[in-house]
Amino acid sequence: SVIKGADYLTADGIGIVKGAKILGSSLPGRVTGFDTMTAILKWCDEERKKIYFLGAKNEVIMTMIEKIKATYPGIVIAGFHDGYFKDESGIVREIQSSEPDFVFCALGFPKQEYFIEKNRRVTDAIWMGIGGSFDVLAGYAERAPQWWIDHHIEWLYRLYKEPTRFLRMMALPKYLLLVYRYKFFGK
């Protein structure tokens, strides 16, 4: 229901694109949260838009904010907070009072999706869940080299770099089974 309530959805994973193809639909292709976020940052820099940043560890968000100030001087930082907070209502009030044009939420899936669904109506901002993009932007994590991305195996590179993701990656074969079950049995 959270996903159905979203205003926009993107295929941030080759599995979604392949699953749609198996089911007879076509998607324009994979659109990563990181690529979307950096394109929006560039546009916000040119248009002097206000952004609120929420998520990641404190040292990550602090480093990222400094890099954004240096790289995108036209962006107005409406506010920011790390992803470790107990008083959700206080964060929501802070976001609301800062009147941002965009809210980038990096709390991880599915926490960020639930947070956005619950709170996005407190402001007219565009809210976007962007997973671990703050870590990449801050330099605490790296994206796969372009070759891996071009060959749709960025997930394999991430597994190689972060073997602790193995259990999470086990959801991928389960997803594929669900796609085929739906294709052949309609359930």
Feature roles, as predicted:
Residues G33-E46:
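Hydrophobic alpha-helical segments within soluble ligand-binding/sensing domains
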Residues A20-V31, P73-K86:
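Glycine-rich phosphate-binding "P-loop"
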Residues Y52-A56, M64-I65, V76-S98, L107-V136, ...:
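Internal alpha/beta domain cores that form substrate/cofactor-binding pockets in large enzymes
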